[in-house]
Amino acid sequence: MATGRGRILQQHWLGLQTLRGPSRGGGAARGRARAFGCRKGPGVKLSAGSAALRCHAGGGQHWESSFSCCSGFLDGMPSEILLKIFSYLDAVSLLCTGCVSRRFYHLANDNFIWIGIYSTAFSPARSNWKFNSVEKIAMSMSFLSVQDKEAGYWKKEYITKQIASVKAALADILKPVNPYTGLPVKTKEALRIFGLGWAIILKEKGGKEYIMEHVDLSINDTSVTVIWYGKKWPCLASLSTLDLCGMTPVFTDWYKTPTKHRLRWHSLIAKYNLSHLTISTMIGCDRLIRIFCLHPGLLVGVWKKEEELAFVMANLHFHHLVERSTLGSATIPYELPPHSPFLDDSPEYGLHGYQLHVDLHSGGVFYLCGTFRNLFTKRGNIENGHVKLIVIHLKNNREHLPLIGKVGLSWKTDIFDGCIKSCSMMDVTLLDEHGKPFWCFSSPVCLRSPATPSDSSSFLGQTYNVDYVDAEGRVHVELVWIRETEEYLIVNLVLYLSIAKINHWFGTEY
């Protein structure tokens, strides 16, 4: 049988050489499967190490004729021979081959091929997975019943286990926690090792979608800033929503491959309504663009003249970032596991032992990086359903803090760049008395003149406020511009924590 197949393959190969004429080079093919592909150059190349079944343009009519010749040759091959070729491909190449045509898709689902890949990757001898005796017996029985499984069963099993192995590795690397921030120590390392990226999906009102991978990112102390820009944005007037998704390679080492067409799964982080780009959400502008803040943490830049998208910027806090970027699906965000309340042994004393870390930054420049420990408030300090936690007291000059440098939010596109005054990114990490993250967020903010005079107006200088609000709390910052030193001075910083959040967290009834 093997000899007969070899002669058939040899005849097909000789026939192909006759049709295409003398070879123009290309060298010997790597691996046994190369013997059945087209030569290096114009046409189609099948190889064990190739990331996809792809066409290499040679230019003009010659490429078209070469491609149609090779394509016709492959389509005319018996399924038995194609299956033999596919059996030499690795998992990545086999998955990409299945995208070429409907026939290739069905052939690339062959259970005998995939069970070989599965058993090689996850055999007890080689895998990091620990199999008990029952699992080993179940696996052996599954191997014996390959023919009884529907087509593609073992492909799905392989991909499912690959994803599970990535998730298990992520959970393991995120276990160590920094006692000062309450966040995983190796978040930055996890982002690098697993090739985690982000994409936005712009959806038109008619249903058409545009997927854009991030162009640039910067990793901060407790957050990551992700940026999208380019020349080919869809018309803003036709867009309805924007989905922010995390992207993770199914195969952990494949993200190093330079090709753009990689196999990844998407995890929905947040969905935004682009009809909310109104005057109420605009936080700043310069001579070229206007910027809008959409909750949570999204900044959208729009050209003033054309009223079209200029860039999108997302600021993502490290708290549960890896889980939210990997463990959700393309349509459903990751849900945090149910919270078990930390029993408060002294509710009559209110909140105590809290710690706050706050950053104000933009473009890698930090205007404020402060940590405040041993924060407390009395139980009776409640206003409008919120517990008031004072971090910087207005009347205590020793607590007042200056901002470093001139505050501004840096932006760039592939053509222009700029800086919008009085805007920046704010990262807040609040830890409870047990050192657990109680409230975390990252969001664009801006300095605004207060609508009504406040107590800080007694200071020499113009006063400004920075305010942030979400379902879990509110941040209020008062600043004074000191003209002599040309710097902002924080004279008041107050957190307002939702009573509903506190009761849920501690099982109390404030």
Swiss-Prot record:
Keywords: Ubl conjugation pathway. It comes from the Eukaryota. It comes from Homo sapiens. Residues 77-117 form the F-box domain. Directly interacts with SKP1 and CUL1. GO terms for cellular component: cytosol; SCF ubiquitin ligase complex. This is F-box only protein 15. Substrate-recognition component of the SCF (SKP1-CUL1-F-box protein)-type E3 ubiquitin ligase complex. PANTHER family: F-BOX ONLY PROTEIN 15. The gene is FBXO15.
